[in-house]
């Protein structure tokens, strides 16, 4: 039992550190030599990378951030499907999945490498959803894309998707740990967007493709 608990703690630490890899921050440093937290919306997420560094960089950051969530859940499944580590109780699998999912999401938004700052955890949460249930992920993504099609406001689309994911999870009758993740991650994404909510209510939230203040010259950046 002690060995199993230590293994679980190690998994939580590993997935937190995985989530903490500051993809958007590194992109800013490598491409323009800037701290992206000082530009645009100050976030290290893909939306601010798009506005600050351009589309190719944003696509790369988005893909890597999604892969963080995918790999966190995949790591748990790999341990349960193999015999290369001490066996963990089968009853723990879904709850351990919940644990690593929360850890990787927190790592993305509260990176130890950035003094506990970071992105808003939307992309990493989506990566987790793809591993929990493909229909859950596709339904949530469809909600996001529908809202962004009509409003062109990324933050509003993320907030609506964070609410909708709970209804989709309930409709799919997912296990309690998965329902817990959709609720906790959904609430967390909304909280992370609190300043965006203020701007939405004031009618000042920038739309996709609009310029924002404090965006550096991208001349020469692909």
Swiss-Prot record:
Q: Name one GO molecular function term.
A: acyl-phosphate glycerol-3-phosphate acyltransferase activity
* Residue ranges crossing the lipid bilayer per the database entry: 4-24, 56-76, 87-107, 130-150, 153-173, 174-191
| EC number(s) on file | 2.3.1.275
Task: Identify the InterPro entries for this entry.
Answer: G3P_acylTferase_PlsY
Q: Where in the cell is it found?
A: Cell inner membrane
Q: Which reaction does it catalyse?
A: an acyl phosphate + sn-glycerol 3-phosphate = a 1-acyl-sn-glycero-3-phosphate + phosphate
Tell me how this protein sits in the membrane. Multi-pass membrane protein
Q: Name one GO cellular component term.
A: plasma membrane
Kindly tell me the pathway this chain contributes to.
Lipid metabolism; phospholipid metabolism
Location (main, coarse): membrane
Q: Name one Pfam family in it.
A: G3P_acyltransf
Specify the domain of life of the species encoding this protein: Bacteria
Alphabetically sorted, this entry's keywords are: Cell inner membrane, Cell membrane, Lipid biosynthesis, Lipid metabolism, Membrane, Phospholipid biosynthesis, Phospholipid metabolism, Transferase, Transmembrane, Transmembrane helix
Q: GO terms for biological process?
A: phospholipid biosynthetic process
Q: What is its biological role?
A: Catalyzes the transfer of an acyl group from acyl-phosphate (acyl-PO(4)) to glycerol-3-phosphate (G3P) to form lysophosphatidic acid (LPA). This enzyme utilizes acyl-phosphate as fatty acyl donor, but not acyl-CoA or acyl-ACP.
User: What family does this belong to?
Assistant: Belongs to the PlsY family.
Q: Assembly state and interactors? A: Probably interacts with PlsX.
Name recorded for this polypeptide:
Glycerol-3-phosphate acyltransferase
Organism the protein comes from: Synechocystis sp. (strain ATCC 27184 / PCC 6803 / Kazusa)
């Amino acid at each position: 039992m002690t060995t199993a608990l230590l293994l679980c703690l190690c998994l939580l630490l590993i997935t937190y550190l995985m989530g903490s890899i500051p993809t958007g921050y590194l992109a800013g440093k490598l491409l323009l030599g800037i701290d992206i937290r000082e530009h645009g919306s100050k976030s290290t997420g893909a939306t601010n990378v798009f506005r600050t560094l351009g589309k190719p960089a944003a696509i790369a950051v988005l893909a890597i951030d999604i892969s963080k969530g995918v790999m966190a859940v995949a790591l748990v499944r790999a341990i349960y499907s193999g015999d290369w580590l001490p066996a963990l109780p089968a009853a723990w699998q879904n709850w351990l999945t919940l644990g690593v999912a929360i850890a990787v999401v927190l790592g993305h938004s509260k990176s130890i490498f950035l003094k506990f700052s970071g992105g808003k955890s939307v992309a990493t949460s989506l990566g987790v959803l793809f591993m929990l249930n493909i229909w859950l992920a596709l339904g949530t993504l469809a909600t996001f894309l529908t809202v962004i099609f009509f409003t062109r406001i990324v933050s509003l689309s993320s907030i609506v998707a964070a609410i909708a994911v709970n209804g989709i999870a309930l409709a799919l009758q997912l296990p309690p740990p998965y329902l817990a993740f959709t609720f906790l991650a959904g609430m967390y994404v909304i909280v992370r967007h609190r300043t965006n909510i203020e701007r939405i209510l004031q009618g000042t939230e920038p739309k996709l493709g609009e310029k924002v203040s404090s965006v550096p010259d991208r001349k020469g950046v692909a």
